[in-house]
Amino acid sequence: RLGLSNDKKIKSDARAEATLNVLHGALHNSHRPLSHQTMFEWQAALFPTGRSGMHKIVTGAYRVHAEPMQIVTPRLDKPDVVHYQAPASEDVQHHMEIFVHWFNTSLRQQDGLVRAALAHLWFETIHPFEDGNGRIGRALVEMALAQDLKTEQRLWSLSQQIWQDRGSYYEQLQTATSRANMDVTPWVQWFVSCIHKAADSSWEQMQSAMRSEE
């Protein structure tokens, strides 16, 4: 027995467990200011072996590689399609200083849902880590929403909703990061609608559970 399918399941379970731990940590630390160290710990927790697949990566720190950080669609017969190129690694610390300051000072100054949407987009635009940016970005959303609602309880699963709508998510993210006029209104509208869908889905699940107990 080679156990290949079982190995794959173990890896999948380990990835899911690591992601859930980070999301849980974001919720339960929502009463504290966001810090670079917090995000370093989140990202390191996602890659406990220091590898992403077969590749060794920098963990617990922002990226430092000289190569451009690009979001691409690989193609076998043609050049890769570059959807977005993030700031150079040497500029990441500066961009993240601004981001962290904004995140910690914008609470109560902006609508909570809008703030969560902007936080996710801004973070993904910087793409500060070698890997794990999407999951860290979702953890920031969980933290922002918990701060706005003043609760550490997960009332809905936004990560699951984004995963279900991932095609639309990547399309909206690409559109938002490529707008020359920096108009992020369509992104915010889409993101808020995604939160509403997640809330509706959670409500339906609770209603179904209550009916099954009657």
Where are these regions (language model features)?
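FIC/Doc superfamily catalytic core
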Residues: 1-214
